[in-house]
Amino acid sequence: MYSRRYVACGLLCLLVIAIDQGHGQEHKPCTTPNGTAGRCVRVRECGYVLDLLRKDLFAHSDTVHLEGLQCGTRPDGGALVCCPAFVNEPNCGPSVFGVRIIGGNDTELGEFPWMALLRFQARNRKIHGNCGASLVSKRFVLSAAHCFTAAKSKGWKIHSVRVAEWNFMNHRGSKDCKQVKGYDVPICRKDYDVARFVQHPEYRVNAGVHVNDIVLIELAADVEYNVFVAPICLPVSNDTAQLPWGSSDDPEIEYTAAGWGSTESGKESTGMSYQLKQINLRAFNKERCKKLFQVPSGVGVGLGHICAGGIRDEDTCHGDSGGPLMEAVGGVWYLAGITSFGWPRCGRDGVPGVYTNISHYMGWLEREMFRGILA
């Protein structure tokens, strides 16, 4: 093994003076030595490489791996590295039933096959389904950080992530599979153990405003895809990365939220619905949203948020936390946000719900997804 000081310096120097790789590669697609898709970027723009350079101890294999990541140079001689990047799976975000303009209706079976349910174990060992989540790949699920902090405050711990759940009443007793009329295969709910979960390091609550309310959950095994289980797309492609999610006040921007949350407005409504519901929501003016959820000092509603809704009785509610706020682009569903917080009484006229803006966190997500798995 080598000391961090000497090897890190040597590697940085090596990366900086490597001028024989060819110019003009910056921001172009590339492939890491491990076969993972990536983008050719500056060293300082790649959190994955920076993490490697910060390691306390280096082995020879680390040096070889970093050398293999070089993908070109800039005109000034600075090195470019192939930074692993999340790539949507080819068939993500399927629009099974088309894009429907509705509000507060039951979903169709298999309509949002990326919906997942977080299950927590209480002190008495009873299992509770308590928050929604979104499947984004065979191994990763996204939800809200506050789902975990709220569970921890009650002495609960994460038990599993369930996919292919649609209607709790369809699986009464011990039945995990149910044959549904009109489908060739049964719908089979399945629970996956959690390998790790990464809460955003700067998550906090400021005067009721949840900031950086996002958690990445890695499953212990690959999810099996079928007609009832598939990932939603993330805003990483060229045609979606530049969409004005979270910053546009255009009321024509339309989202869809889904979850098992309460269907009754009011502070006392804290239960969950048996049936997976969906609701159509329009973008809400960000400046008005900031004033409604004004904080006395510090960080409040900002770039990391999307505000949507504001029409009486059309809102996400208790139990919807962690679930997806979705936008359809070209007939494909993308994860725009994560249900975060709102007014204590759901569905109040003129008051929107607030969602974590996924596009704002793509850099952090990519960094955490690839942390430690490529070296």
UniProtKB/Swiss-Prot annotation:
**Induction info:** Induced by infection with E.coli or S.aureus bacteria. Induced by infection with P.berghei parasite following ookinete invasion of the midgut cells. Induced to some extent upon sterile injury.
Could you confirm whether the keyword Transmembrane helix appears in this record?
A: no
Where is the secretion signal located? 1-24
Spell out the InterPro entries in the cross-references: CLIP, CLIP_sf, Peptidase_S1_PA, Peptidase_S1_PA_chymotrypsin, Peptidase_S1A, Ser/Thr_Proteases_Immune/Dev, Trypsin_dom, TRYPSIN_HIS
For this protein's source organism, the top of the classification is: Eukaryota, Metazoa, Ecdysozoa, Arthropoda, Hexapoda
Q: Which residues form the Peptidase S1 domain?
A: 101-370
Q: Where is this site: Cleavage?
A: 100-101
Where are the glycosylation sites? Answer: 34, 105, 238, 357
Q: Does the keyword Hydrolase apply?
A: yes
Protein name (database record): CLIP domain-containing serine protease B14
Loss of this gene results in the following: RNAi-mediated knockdown in the G3 strain reduces survival following infection by E.coli bacteria but not following infection by S.aureus bacteria. Following P.berghei infection, the number of parasite oocysts in the gut is increased in the susceptible G3 strain due to a failure to kill or/and lyse ookinetes (the motile parasite zygote that enters the gut to form an oocyst). RNAi-mediated knockdown in the refractory L3-5 strain results in an increase in the number of killed and melanized ookinetes following P.berghei infection.
A Gene Ontology cellular component where this protein is annotated is: extracellular space
What is the purpose of this protein?
Answer: Serine protease. Plays a role in innate immunity against infections by parasite P.berghei and by Gram-negative bacteria such as E.coli. In response to P.berghei infection, contributes to the clearing of parasite ookinetes independent of melanization, an innate immune response which consists in the deposition of melanin pigments on invading pathogens and parasites. May play a role in non-septic wound healing.
Single annotated GO MF: serine-type endopeptidase activity
Name the family the entry cites.
Belongs to the peptidase S1 family. CLIP subfamily.
State the tissue distribution.
Expressed by a subpopulation of hemocytes.
The residues annotated as the active site are 146, 213, 321
Q: What is its EC number?
A: 3.4.21.-
The UniProt keyword set, sorted, is:
Disulfide bond, Glycoprotein, Hydrolase, Immunity, Innate immunity, Protease, Secreted, Serine protease, Signal
Domain Clip: residue ranges: 29-83
**Which residue windows are coiled coil?**
none
Q: What is known of its domains?
A: The clip domain consists of 35-55 residues which are 'knitted' together usually by 3 conserved disulfide bonds forming a clip-like compact structure.
Q: Which cysteines are joined by disulfide bonds?
A: 30-82, 40-71, 46-83, 131-147, 289-307, 317-346
**Which gene is the coding source of this polypeptide chain?**
CLIPB14
